């Protein structure tokens, strides 16, 4: 996961705990979860729109004589 080992993750979590305190962690995690959910939703919408555009047959060209 991003090239981080177990020790690095534990160290990062300890720093976050020291910076924000135990009382704020659930609130931070909730906000992070909501943000990730919104990001994934937007990503899915963009992928669906892209697939619609790619799968549409090309418009027929008008020929002039």
UniProtKB/Swiss-Prot annotation:
The protein, known as: Sec-independent protein translocase protein TatA
Family: Belongs to the TatA/E family.
Single Gene Ontology BP annotation: protein transport by the Tat complex
Pfam families named in the record: TatA_B_E
Gene name, Swiss-Prot/TrEMBL: tatA
Transmembrane segments: 1-21
Function noted in UniProt: Part of the twin-arginine translocation (Tat) system that transports large folded proteins containing a characteristic twin-arginine motif in their signal peptide across membranes. TatA could form the protein-conducting channel of the Tat system.
UniProt-listed PANTHER family: SEC-INDEPENDENT PROTEIN TRANSLOCASE PROTEIN TATA
HAMAP family listed in its UniProt record: TatA_E
Gene Ontology cellular component terms for the protein in this record: TAT protein transport complex
Assembly behavior: Forms a complex with TatC.
Cell compartments where the protein resides: Cell inner membrane
GO molecular function: protein transmembrane transporter activity
UniProt KW Kinase keyword: no
Organism: Chlorobium phaeobacteroides (strain DSM 266 / SMG 266 / 2430)
Principal subcellular localisation of the protein: membrane
Keywords: Cell inner membrane, Cell membrane, Membrane, Protein transport, Translocation, Transmembrane, Transmembrane helix, Transport
Superkingdom assignment: Bacteria
Topology class, membrane: Single-pass membrane protein
């Amino acid at each position: 996961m991003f090239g981080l080992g177990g020790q690095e993750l534990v160290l990062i979590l300890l720093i976050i705990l020291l910076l924000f305190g135990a009382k704020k962690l659930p609130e931070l995690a909730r906000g992070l979860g909501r943000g990730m959910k919104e990001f994934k939703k937007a990503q899915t919408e963009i992928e669906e729109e892209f697939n619609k555009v790619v799968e549409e047959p090309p418009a027929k060209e008008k020929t002039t004589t």
